[in-house]
Amino acid sequence: MASSQVGDMVNGNAEPTRHLAKFPPSLWGDRFTSFTLDKQLWDKYGNEIEVLKEQVRSMVVAGGRKAAEQINLINVLERLGVSYHFEKEIEEQLEQLFAKFEDNEDYDLFTIALHFRIFRQHGYKMSCDVFNKFRDSNGEFKETMSNDVQGMLSLYEATYLKIRGEGFLDEAHAFTIAQLESLVGGPHLSSDLSEQVMHALKQSIHRGFPRLEAKHFISFYEKDASRNETLLRLAKLDFNQLQLSHREELCHIFRWWKELDLISKVPYARDRAVECFFWSTCAYYEPQHFVGRAVLTKIMLLLSVTDDTYDAYGTYDELKLYTNAVQRWDVSAMDELPDYMKALYRALLNVYDEVERDLAKQGRDYGVHHSKEAFKEIVRSYEIEAEWFKEGYVASFEAYMKNALVTSTGRLHTTSCFMGLEADVATTEAFEWILTKPKMVAASGAIGRLVDDVMSHDEEQERGHVATGLDCYMKQHGVSKQEAIVELYKMIENAWRDINEEILKPTAISMKLLIRVLNLSRISDVVYKYVDGYTHPEIIKDHVISLFEDPIPM
């Protein structure tokens, strides 16, 4: 990842040639520097939300509703983004529904696929056999399916919960995409349904940013003739109130970052405070996790600048000094560093000290050590890539991935994310679980690493960069770039299968923790879907504005 010294130095004081990336600047100026929370509006939203929550809670636990109606209610609550208010009630209902589920011949494709998706999302391993009745004697999908747009859409979304060995869901995925794409814009779909289909094809429910997908669904649900006005009202109020909270938090983070003034000392680095907070909000959006969002954002910002230092500025000799300093984690190590690295190193130590003090007040600072160790590990792996780049070495794909699963930040992000959760959820055992290199964390890291390798490949190679996974695979297997991309995306899909399998019961740790790893995987899908949206933030600018600035009209 490092820039190397190119050419001979004229003398010992000459500045080495550096492969500067010339990253796009921050988009935001002082846009998020100030924000005053409207307390009156906040209280107004909050008072009505509490009333509506009790009404909806009564709906969830009320008896007499058919299973299909109950599963649909749970689906609507989740897609509207308000299910986090009713987690206990929903889990109790799903446990009963799964225990009593029968493959009723009266259930249509929409209902079966909905059951499958909801059960799988909550860890219940429903068999793919429930879809057998939608295949003919030759094993082909029945022709009547093509006319059931809602059923096809429901099945399409369900296929994203597949695990390894479920060939039927692979076939169903390809089939539903082909059918839905052929219907978009045609005479058989209303404009509203066509809009839903187009959005689903662009972004699935399971891999989407939860809060953004909730906002999209609210706009669709509002046009649904069968909508429940109580649910719709609660969803709008909840989104807008939580948006106010997030906007206030973002203002605090943005000001903190400006006051830290690190970018002025390392101007080669990406200035991405807003984007890092956006990322953290995907990991956990719920109001009680405000400390976690701040902690994760700060650590991500430091890692981002560290990444750019190894990737686009530091010489190999400078980077070795920095790696050693991080391993020591002691202020005295600063004396050995170049001036620009001193600023970064000082910020690293100070921010972790600040985070540790804040978490100690709540009795949950025991995770900080694990985060520091993960940071040290990443820096060691950055140095390995720096050496590869200096030597012009193209590693085997296996050797590359062994190192890349560290630089993908899966362990660091997961550890830092857990630090922001309640002590009774993120226990010492949870942090020890991360040390076992669990399949889910590795899969999450692989998704982020491989999709980034594909999306940023051309730009990175143009300026000079260590061989990526794409390059390593091409060389080792003697294939074209396009062929290698196909293979890497197969690996990404298998990583998603592993994540889906890891959330099936019985799980290694609490689902409240696993959902955070899933969310960290989701943000990779959103940010790197078509291009590197972190390096080029204009790609996700509309998402940021939608999430933090634009309220839903009441």
UniProtKB/Swiss-Prot annotation:
Pathway: Secondary metabolite biosynthesis; terpenoid biosynthesis. Binds 3 Mg(2+) ions per subunit. A motif (DDXXD motif) lies at residues 326-330. It catalyses: (2E,6E)-farnesyl diphosphate + H2O = valerianol + diphosphate. GO terms for molecular function: carbon-oxygen lyase activity, acting on phosphates; magnesium ion binding; terpene synthase activity. InterPro entries: Isoprenoid_synthase_dom_sf, Terpene_cyclase-like_1_C, Terpene_cyclase_plant_C1, Terpene_synth_N, Terpene_synth_N_sf, Terpene_synthase-like, Terpene_synthase_metal-bd, Terpenoid_cyclase/PrenylTrfase. It comes from the Eukaryota. The Asp-Asp-Xaa-Xaa-Asp/Glu (DDXXD/E) motif is important for the catalytic activity, presumably through binding to Mg(2+). This is Valerianol synthase TPS1E. The lineage of its organism: Eukaryota, Viridiplantae, Streptophyta, Embryophyta, Tracheophyta.
